[in-house]
Amino acid sequence: MLLARMNPQVQPENNGADTGPEQPLRARKTAELLVVKERNGVQCLLAPRDGDAQPRETWGKKIDFLLSVVGFAVDLANVWRFPYLCYKNGGGAFLIPYTLFLIIAGMPLFYMELALGQYNREGAATVWKICPFFKGVGYAVILIALYVGFYYNVIIAWSLYYLFSSFTLNLPWTDCGHTWNSPNCTDPKLLNGSVLGNHTKYSKYKFTPAAEFYERGVLHLHESSGIHDIGLPQWQLLLCLMVVVIVLYFSLWKGVKTSGKVVWITATLPYFVLFVLLVHGVTLPGASNGINAYLHIDFYRLKEATVWIDAATQIFFSLGAGFGVLIAFASYNKFDNNCYRDALLTSSINCITSFVSGFAIFSILGYMAHEHKVNIEDVATEGAGLVFILYPEAISTLSGSTFWAVVFFVMLLALGLDSSMGGMEAVITGLADDFQVLKRHRKLFTFGVTFSTFLLALFCITKGGIYVLTLLDTFAAGTSILFAVLMEAIGVSWFYGVDRFSNDIQQMMGFRPGLYWRLCWKFVSPAFLLFVVVVSIINFKPLTYDDYIFPPWANWVGWGIALSSMVLVPIYVIYKFLSTQGSLWERLAYGITPENEHHLVAQRDIRQFQLQHWLAI
């Protein structure tokens, strides 16, 4: 992958990717031999590139971009994780650290990635022409996005399987008596607080029809003894996975021109469904108890470090910074697009969606607690157990249960598809911008990316596939993505320079970011990311799935997966340093100087070697 050898002499780039600063707002003449531009008082002569005759494609409409960003950021975690975290960590009090981290870290990082992609008009790898040593960060986030595609599509396939299973008069997770049920299967109507006892929460009870349908009917987990015994792929999930991958391919094969139209459905449909579920949910008996539990305010919980840690990690993963998606999406914007307004709007929509979804979730949980005569805490849970066990079970008791099941799983399907589309686009754009042969064969390359995710996802749809999925979900995009974004923030804010980055934004939109944003980029956001990275390592616990404890070798494999992306950062620095001609001083200078300023190295005029560069804000 690391094929390009840098020449220290000043040569025009010829990678075919159109960049913002070299595409002025006025129409350019293709016959020009030289373009003179000024950046930070330094005039650079830039030879026009071969790709200038074919300018970079842009979104068909501005709304296509906004819906794509919202669709990517608003995913399954908004439904199955945030509401439970809010409930668990003091209810309304949790919104204080959550909002604080949104303002001082989430939004600044979101804004930074959009501006970075829009100005340079490059994917996650080639955007690092601003600081060549950091190109390994781009490769790292591309690999992480690919890893996520291996297992995230499987969760979408589960949703599709549930959707197909919902087209029956009697939902299959309503009662016992099916081939997948165990002798211990218990009618939910017979379960209450006295039957369960004091030590068993309803959400953890494994013998309800809904729980057995998920673990035995869908996953076939009972046929596997652990991660060492995964078995063969299940044909039902195989077909669903094929459908998901085919939909993804035809959504992405022509770039943003097709994906920008698909998100009109996948990004908006969940809001209609969420509204319908919310309106119906609040009318159910016990719903008010669930909502009160969700919104209860316990300020004393703010004294606990875990509350702040949960808020920090949730805001980071919720916004989706660091996967290369925001950079890729923004690279197809018009150069003068107001990405500042876009960042504020889309990040706010994402967080508001998380909060509102809690009402739809906890109204149903309150209803379940009322029906089974247990406390809210006995039914409250997060993750797959919420959306594939508890919520479907609650739906099965409603009048017109088939309709509500179809509506709910259509929402999950839409939430998953546009998020997966974003991850795949990050991989495709990131590599296609780096290797022009891939860009020239976009359709074939898109097929290769989607098909590779299909092949490796086969391990996750085996009888023990949930163990593989849990391993990937924990390690593939955990500490590694936090590390990658930390490096990204340092590369932009310190090596490239906040002042220079602010000037780039001024060229695009006509105004410089305020002091608040510059301080966040240079100090607050890197400190926030460093804090989250350290906490994620300190709080690591050996991997488990319910009562199953993963063997030690599985944890080592997991850390190997995590390190496989992180090591790309130092490996590329070493590669770039060794492959560059010149003295040690010149090699270092070329590695930290933007490519369009390499002529300054010969003049020994390097910003990064001056104290003023590091102190500038």
UniProtKB/Swiss-Prot annotation:
Any further remark recorded for this protein: This protein is the target of psychomotor stimulants such as amphetamines or cocaine.
- Bilayer-spanning residue ranges: 63-88, 93-116, 136-166, 234-254, 258-282, 307-332, 339-362, 403-428, 444-464, 466-492, 523-545, 549-569
Which residues get glycosylated? N184, N192, N198
Question: Which one Pfam family would you cite for this protein?
Answer: SNF
Q: What is the effect of changing L444A?
A: Decreased homodimerization and norepinephrine transport
What would changing G423A do, according to UniProt?
Loss of norepinephrine binding. Abolishes norepinephrine uptake
Organism (species): Homo sapiens
Its chief place of residence is: membrane
Annotated protein name in UniProt:
Sodium-dependent noradrenaline transporter
Identify the taxonomic lineage of the organism of origin.
Answer: Eukaryota, Metazoa, Chordata, Craniata, Vertebrata
What InterPro entries does the record tag this protein with?
Na/ntran_symport (IPR000175), Na/ntran_symport_noradrenaline (IPR002435), SNS_sf (IPR037272)
Its GO CC terms are: axon; cell surface; membrane; neuronal cell body membrane; plasma membrane; presynaptic membrane; synaptic vesicle membrane
The UniProt entry, under SUPFAM superfamilies, shows: SNF-like
Q: Which family does it belong to?
A: Belongs to the sodium:neurotransmitter symporter (SNF) (TC 2.A.22) family. SLC6A2 subfamily.
Effect on the protein upon substituting F323A: Loss of norepinephrine binding. Abolishes norepinephrine uptake
